[in-house]
C-alpha cells in the first residue's frame, strides 16, 4: 500500500512539473491547444491594418506591413504566427518603439519590454510568403484555408480570434483588386495604384482574402443588392452564362434570407471566377472564389453539370 501511495505521489509531482511552463519557454511549432486557449483568453479587440506592395513581375517579392492592435488582460509575451523564413521579418515596433526580433518555431515572440496592460500596437515590416499567394503572370489570389494565413503575414492564426481587417494594396496601375470589404479610395501615382479598402466585419484569418490582377468585370443589381463578377474567360459562349450565374447567386441569397429570417450579414457579395482554382469554391465573405470549369460550362452541358453549378453556388452562399 505504501509502495502504491509513493508511486501515486511521484506521478502527481511529475505531472505538476510537466505542466509548469517556465517564463521564456520556446513555443511549439504550429498552434498548440494551450497556446490557442491562452491567446483567446488574454487577447481581445483585435484589428489588423495590412498593406501589401505587389509587383507586376511575379518573381519579385511582395513587401508587407501589418499593424496589429489588441487589448491584453495582463503583461506577458505576445506570440504571433509566421510560418516563413525568419529573415523575412524586417522590423518590429511595439507601441511605437523599435524592438528586437525574436523568432522561434514559426512564431514571432514579442517580449514585454514595451507591452502594457490594455491597448497595444505591434507593427511589423515583412516580406510576404508566396505559398498562399497563388501568383500567376497577370493575377494572384490568396487562399488561406485552413491555417495558412500565417504563411502570408504575421497573425494569430486560429479561427476563434476574429478580427477587423483594414487592407491597402499597392498594385500596377492597369490592375484591379477585390477583397472582403468595399473599396474606400484609389490613388494613382507613377504607374502604380494604391487601393484602400473599408474595414471588414470581424473575420477569422482563414476567411481574409484579396485578389489582384487583370480581370474583366460585370455587375448586376437586384433588390437593393449589387453583385460584381470578376473573370478572365474570353470565350463569348461562356461569358454569356453570367446571366444564369447572377440568377443563381441572387436566388440563393433570397432563399436563405427567407428561410432563416436573417438578412445577408456582410456588406457585399462579389464573386471571382478563377482559372484553375484548387476547389469548387471558397466562401470568403465579400469575395467568393469559384473554379472556372465549374462555373463556365461548355456549349452542351449535362444536367449534372448544371445542377452541380447551382449546388456549388448555393453551398458557398450558405457558408456565410
Which residues fall in each region the model found?
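Hydrophobic helix-coil surface modules that form long, contiguous segments used
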Residues: 158-314
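N-terminal, polar/Ser/Thr-rich
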Residues: 20-63, 90, 134-138, 159
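Short active-site segment of divalent metal-dependent hydrolases/proteases
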Residues: 317-318
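Surface-exposed beta-strand/loop patches in extracellular or lumenal glycoproteins
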Residues: 65-86, 157, 163-172
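Bacterial Sec-dependent N-terminal signal peptides
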Residues: 1-29
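A surface-exposed beta-strand-loop module
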Residues: 83-140, 190
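Short, hydrophobic/aromatic-enriched beta-strand segments in well-ordered soluble domains
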Residues: 64-70, 118-133, 165-173, 195-201, ...
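Glycine/proline-rich low-complexity spacer/linker segments in large multi-domain proteins
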Residues: 27-41, 116-117, 125-169, 213-221
Amino acid at each position: 500500500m505504501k509502495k502504491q501511495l509513493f508511486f501515486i505521489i511521484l506521478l502527481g509531482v511529475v505531472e505538476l512539473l510537466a505542466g509548469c511552463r517556465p517564463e521564456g519557454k520556446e513555443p511549439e511549432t504550429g498552434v498548440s491547444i494551450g497556446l490557442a486557449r491562452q491567446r483567446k483568453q488574454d487577447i481581445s479587440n483585435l484589428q489588423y491594418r495590412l498593406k501589401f506592395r505587389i509587383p507586376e513581375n511575379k518573381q519579385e517579392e511582395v513587401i508587407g506591413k501589418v499593424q496589429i492592435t489588441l487589448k491584453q488582460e495582463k503583461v506577458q509575451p505576445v506570440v504571433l504566427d509566421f510560418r516563413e523564413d525568419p529573415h523575412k521579418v524586417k522590423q518590429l515596433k511595439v507601441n511605437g518603439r523599435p524592438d528586437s526580433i525574436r523568432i522561434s518555431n514559426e512564431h514571432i515572440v514579442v517580449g514585454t519590454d514595451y507591452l502594457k496592460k490594455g491597448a497595444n500596437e505591434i507593427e511589423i515590416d515583412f516580406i510576404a510568403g508566396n505559398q498562399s499567394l497563388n501568383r500567376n503572370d497577370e493575377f494572384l489570389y490568396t487562399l488561406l484555408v485552413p491555417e495558412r494565413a500565417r504563411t502570408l503575414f504575421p497573425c494569430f492564426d486560429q479561427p476563434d480570434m476574429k478580427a477587423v481587417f483594414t487592407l491597402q494594396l499597392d498594385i500596377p496601375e492597369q490592375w484591379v483588386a477585390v477583397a472582403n470589404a468595399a473599396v474606400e479610395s484609389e490613388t494613382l501615382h507613377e504607374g502604380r495604384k494604391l487601393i484602400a479598402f473599408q474595414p471588414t466585419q470581424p473575420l477569422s484569418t482563414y476567411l481574409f482574402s484579396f485578389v489582384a490582377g487583370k480581370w474583366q468585370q460585370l455587375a448586376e443589381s437586384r433588390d437593393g443588392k449589387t453583385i460584381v463578377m470578376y473573370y478572365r474567360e474570353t470565350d463569348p459562349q461562356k461569358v454569356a452564362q453570367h446571366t444564369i450565374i447572377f440568377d443563381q447567386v441572387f436566388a440563393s441569397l433570397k432563399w436563405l434570407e427567407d428561410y432563416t429570417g436573417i438578412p445577408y450579414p456582410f456588406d457585399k457579395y462579389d464573386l471571382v471566377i478563377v482559372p484553375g482554382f484548387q476547389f469548387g469554391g471558397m466562401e470568403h465573405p465579400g469575395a467568393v472564389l469559384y473554379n472556372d470549369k465549374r462555373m463556365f460550362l461548355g456549349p452542351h452541358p449535362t444536367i449534372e453539370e448544371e445542377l452541380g453549378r447551382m449546388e456549388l453556388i448555393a453551398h458557398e452562399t450558405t457558408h456565410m
